[in-house]
Amino acid sequence: MKTAIISSKASVNHLTGDGHPEQPKRVTAITERLKKNKSLIWDKPASFDQNILKKVHDENYVDMVKKSFPNQGLKFLDGDTIISPGSKDATVDAVGSVIKAIDGVEQKKF
């Protein structure tokens, strides 16, 4: 069985503030540890049509999230989710990673 890691550097720009578990240092530490495993397949997120988001989320929700990313500083999207200017690219790459993973499994690449 092959295992893939689908990732980009955008995740380190998703800032959530001190004390929050989603930290760039954590992502970097995990990535560095995984790079030691030579049997993993590394890939980048897929590009995708943004309309695909509306197949799994309400259109109003998708539009609200797209408009919510701050130009500076941190912002609560809801009671649990903190976003920053870098969160937009990180979210796009997260969706692209899921799409790449599904495609890779379907095509038996991993």
Language-model features: where?
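HDAC/HDAC-like amidohydrolase catalytic core signature
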Residues: 1-110
